């Protein structure tokens, strides 16, 4: 597979350096000029990808070398569709990865996709030292095409001039912009990162402000020229996935549960599923479907409203008890439990699983996960290796269904004590988020199980072997 679209990676020295401001602002600015921008987030983060998608007015996608093979990365780029520019926002610092060698870093991804890198540098209370940091990044790996720099949080015109002169005098890459300190951040955050684009009350205003900042303070034409300088990138071809069976799957999606990779939904459809979207905050009953898919999100923020939907919770609980396949991740796990403890109050949830889940002040699980299936279940064959990620501020504090965990974690927190993945009947619930490009057998297995139930067959999944 050959990828020819212009490509650009926006990286930083660290988290909170200003990458999202530049990437989202640039995506919105170019989109408003009539260019088609395919936005990507390096890593598994849903929220940043959502903002990039909102900025570009098309789905924001993820690229991750831990979750995906090079062939899957190529397919991920191809799934962005025909575009005038593929824009990748990095995560953390340019060389920060899984270990001291920077494995699975933004730099590694930039080399794989053959894209020039623009480094966003927070220059707060620094001048010539900025040049040293930039040159250090360039010297760290000569195979990384560090092609330009954008200064962020510049204090004054003099500050900008001194930093520019220091970088140029040291032989650094061109400085392509200087964003001043802002009175307020257009992208506010909360415990899992940014406020989601779907929930931001003034999302469009925030994106237009970001676009205006980029237009005013960054050499946009130079960034476009860099993207167009990216050479063709060759990737191995992936085997196509044939449709499994017709099935109707309900996806529970609204403000409470909004974390779904576009590729996961597309993979389900390609495997034969017809998707119908249902809001657990608004619906009173579950439509006639063959399975339910529940992603992550912020059920703790909307716990009172979820609890108020007693009729829908009862309908879902009765359907699961009758054997309806239900697949849930993270926030979905929390919703399937008996009760959710948050803010000093207890809120009844769906009650499909005997679990009491408590919202915590700090993260209980955050990062990549490596797991292996150790027990029989309808979803994954025993011995299957899975790779995904977790990010949750909650823990299971009670309930008998904890003993039904079928995943052994080689990396990650999950339910605790090295376990995750509760399988009860045809219900699967875990803190583990899977990406369809990293686990290509997942979608066919979900659709097969759903289709088997439709036809009155005792279905079993077909996910087996290694996830990658």
Predicted features and spans:
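Residues that mark the start of a beta-strand
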Residues: 7, 35-36, 246-248, 274, ...
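C-terminal and late-domain segments of enzyme folds
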Residues: 110, 243-245, 257-267, 274-275, ...
């Amino acid at each position: 597979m050959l990828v020819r679209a212009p490509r650009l990676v926006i990286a930083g020295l660290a988290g909170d350096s200003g990458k999202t401001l530049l990437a989202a602002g640039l995506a919105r600015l170019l989109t408003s000029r009539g260019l088609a921008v395919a936005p990507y987030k390096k890593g598994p983060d849903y929220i940043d990808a959502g903002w990039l998608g909102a900025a570009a007015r098309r789905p924001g996608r993820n690229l991750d070398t831990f979750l995906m093979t090079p062939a899957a990365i190529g397919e991920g780029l191809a799934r962005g569709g025909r575009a005038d520019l593929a824009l990748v926002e990095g995560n953390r610092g340019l060389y920060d990865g899984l270990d001291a060698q920077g494995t699975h870093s933004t730099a590694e991804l930039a080399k794989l996709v053959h894209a020039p890198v623009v480094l966003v540098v927070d220059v707060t209370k620094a001048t010539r030292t900025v040049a040293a940091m930039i040159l250090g990044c360039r010297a760290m790996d000569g195979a990384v095409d560090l092609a330009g720099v954008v200064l962020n949080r510049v204090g004054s015109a003099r500050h900008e001039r001194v930093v520019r002169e220091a970088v140029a005098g040291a032989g650094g890459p061109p400085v392509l912009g200087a964003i001043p300190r802002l009175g307020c951040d257009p992208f506010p955050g909360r415990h899992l990162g940014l406020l989601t684009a779907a929930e931001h009350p003034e999302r469009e205003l925030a994106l237009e402000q970001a676009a205006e900042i980029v237009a005013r303070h960054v050499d946009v034409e130079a960034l476009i020229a860099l993207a167009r300088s990216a050479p063709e990138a060759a990737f191995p071809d992936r085997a196509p996935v044939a449709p499994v069976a017709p099935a109707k799957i309900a996806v529970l999606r609204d403000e409470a549960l909004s974390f779904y990779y576009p590729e996961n939904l597309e993979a389900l459809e390609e495997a034969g599923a017809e998707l119908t979207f249902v809001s657990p905050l608004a619906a009173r009953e579950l439509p006639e479907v063959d399975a339910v898919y529940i992603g992550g999100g912020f059920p703790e923020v909307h716990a009172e409203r979820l609890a108020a939907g007693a009729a829908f919770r009862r309908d879902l609980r009765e359907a699961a008890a009758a054997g309806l396949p239900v697949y849930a991740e993270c926030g979905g796990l929390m919703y399937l439990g008996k009760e959710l403890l948050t803010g000093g109050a207890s809120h009844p949830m769906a009650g499909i699983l005997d679990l009491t889940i408590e919202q915590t002040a700090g993260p209980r699980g955050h990062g990549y996960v490596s797991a292996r299936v150790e027990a029989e279940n309808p979803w994954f064959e025993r011995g299957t290796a899975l790779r995904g990620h977790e990010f949750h501020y909650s823990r299971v504090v009670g309930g008998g269904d904890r003993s039904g965990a079928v995943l052994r974690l080689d990396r990650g927190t999950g339910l605790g004590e090295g376990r995750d993945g509760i399988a009860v009947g045809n219900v699967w619930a875990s803190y583990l988020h899977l990406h369809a490009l990293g686990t290509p057998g997942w979608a066919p297995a979900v659709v097969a199980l759903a289709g088997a139930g439709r036809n009155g067959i005792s279905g079993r999944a077909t996910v087996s072997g290694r996830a990658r």
